[in-house]
């Protein structure tokens, strides 16, 4: 192709509603990112105020781009041409390579999309804009292009220098590298949450605009994409269409099956360049690398704890120096961080602005309400891809994943015991120090952990927030409810390795094993 005039109409693609529905969520996200980034590049190069095309407005709002008429793009390019000599502006080699032509955008979406498809014949694409064959190749001509052939040959020329993962398209590598750099350039103006990809921001913004959200009728969980809802609904109906031919284990999502099959093949494609350790999942490699990166970054000279950023280290230093600049005027208690003071003051004011609509219970923090509501809905949004176990809290998932990885990087200097999480080490060390900082105001009993105090206080209040949906029996502790529910389900997860007898509770198994240990 001749390297001459490149305008927005050359780097944009029209879709009808019918064609847009044929794309999966991955292809749609890539389309949004490519078009928005190209538009941003063109505007920055033009250096002037240009009326924004409707397709860009819709994409920024998370709406469907097929609603745009072609006349809008024509109006925008005429506006640009009237202000600048665009041929001179965009004819340079670097500019041309940065701004993809229209067929290249289509080609990229196709080649990336084929990785997610079972067969290339399933991809529903056709050219919409009527152009000459020289400027806009047809679908048949695209199949002969080198980049499109990469999707069949599995050629991935763009490799990440950090972890070695390779990609077929440069843009995918750019997105991926933000995982290592931590860059999240796209920020939501409503809530301040930041994202690595523009498409992720667009999808997130639908939560605020309530534009075409998909709600699960079983548990009320909200999705911004219909395909995500369909996959989620398999949890409720128990559908697991993807079965492992080796062991018969079935999965809801094809990606879970692919990961599982590596157990049988022994494949560990993700290798750490620092120590050579290999992992089955990329997420496990990333977690492992964070520990290595932390060792090289900001380390506390007092206790050796490492941080990825200097601000985290500065906050941590206050633990050792005892600096607590934010003091409560009511009781004199001081805090290291202003946010801690704000939350603490609600104890004195009694403010609990977050109330549960199911049971009326109120909370001083929105996060506590969110966690509480999952008791009623049964929602456990965080899934372990190794064993398909679900968790209500992300921290519980991270803690659990350490079981599969087998890493315990935090070692107690007193007794040598190692832990997966730094918080676990901190809790453990209080055993050696004899520290019990959490006191019950009712009976003066002290506890090492805040969670222990919270559980204990329910004895005085009589509160039993965890009720069984089968028989209505209520419990103080969630763990007690889980044990009770096994009576109804018949589940006995703890099996004796000697005689294969199974038990509902681990304590029952421990007691039983004494029979075999008697000499």
Curated annotation (Swiss-Prot):
It holds the Pfam family zf-C2H2. One of its GO terms (cellular component) is nucleus. InterPro entries: KRAB, KRAB_dom_sf, Znf_C2H2_sf, Znf_C2H2_type. It is found in: Nucleus. Belongs to the krueppel C2H2-type zinc-finger protein family. May be involved in transcriptional regulation. This is Zinc finger protein 30 homolog. The lineage of its organism: Eukaryota, Metazoa, Chordata, Craniata, Vertebrata.
């Amino acid at each position: 192709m001749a390297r001459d005039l490149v305008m927005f109409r050359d780097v944009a693609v029209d879709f009808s509603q019918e064609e847009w529905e044929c794309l999966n969520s991955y292809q749609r996200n890539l389309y949004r990112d490519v078009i928005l980034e190209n538009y941003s590049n063109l505007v920055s190069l033009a250096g002037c105020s240009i009326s924004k095309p409707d397709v860009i407005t819709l994409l920024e709002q998370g709406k469907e781009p097929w609603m745009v008429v072609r006349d809008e793009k024509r109006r925008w390019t005429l506006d640009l041409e009237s202000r600048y000599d665009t041929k001179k502006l965009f004819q340079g080699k670097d500019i041309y390579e940065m701004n993809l032509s229209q067929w290249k955008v289509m080609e990229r979406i196709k080649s990336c999309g084929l990785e997610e498809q079972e067969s290339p014949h399933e991809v529903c694409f056709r050219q919409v804009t009527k152009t000459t064959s020289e400027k806009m190749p047809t679908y048949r001509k695209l199949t002969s292009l080198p980049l499109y052939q990469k999707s069949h040959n599995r050629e991935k020329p763009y490799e990440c220098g950090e972890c070695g993962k390779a990609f077929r398209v440069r843009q995918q590598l750019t997105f991926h590298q933000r995982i290592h750099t931590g860059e999240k350039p796209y920020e939501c103006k409503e809530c301040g949450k930041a994202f690595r990809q523009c498409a992720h921001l667009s999808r997130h913004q639908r939560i605020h605009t309530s534009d075409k959200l998909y709600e699960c009728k079983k548990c009320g969980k909200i999705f911004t994409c219909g395909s995500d809802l369909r996959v989620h609904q398999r949890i409720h109906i128990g559908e697991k269409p993807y079965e492992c031919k080796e062991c018969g284990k079935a999965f809801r999502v094809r990606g879970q099956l692919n990961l599982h099959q590596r157990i049988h093949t022994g494949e560990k494609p993700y290798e750490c360049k620092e120590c050579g350790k290999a992992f089955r999942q990329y997420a496990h490699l990333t977690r492992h690398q964070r520990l290595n990166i932390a060792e090289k970054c900001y380390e506390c000279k007092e206790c050796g704890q490492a941080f990825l950023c200097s601000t985290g280290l500065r906050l941590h230093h206050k633990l050792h120096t005892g600096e607590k600049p934010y003091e409560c005027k009511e009781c004199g208690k001081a805090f290291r961080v202003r946010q801690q003071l704000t939350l603490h003051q609600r104890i004195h004011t009694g403010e609990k602005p977050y109330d549960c609509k199911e049971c009326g219970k109120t909370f001083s923090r929105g996060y506590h309400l969110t966690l509480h509501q999952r008791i009623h809905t049964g929602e456990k949004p965080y899934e372990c891809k190794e064993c398909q176990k679900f968790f209500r809290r992300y921290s519980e998932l991270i803690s659990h994943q350490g079981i599969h990885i087998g890493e315990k990087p935090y070692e107690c200097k007193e007794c040598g015991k190692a832990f997966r999480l730094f918080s676990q080490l901190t809790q453990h060390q209080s055993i050696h120090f004899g520290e019990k900082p959490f006191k019950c105001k009712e009976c003066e009993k002290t506890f090492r952990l805040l969670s222990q105090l919270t559980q204990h206080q329910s004895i005085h209040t009589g509160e039993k927030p965890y009720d069984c949906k089968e028989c209505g029996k209520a419990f103080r502790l969630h763990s007690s409810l889980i044990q009770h529910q096994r009576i109804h389900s018949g589940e006995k997860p703890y099996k004796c390795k000697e005689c294969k007898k199974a038990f509902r509770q681990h304590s029952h198994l421990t007691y039983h094993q004494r029979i075999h240990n008697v000499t």
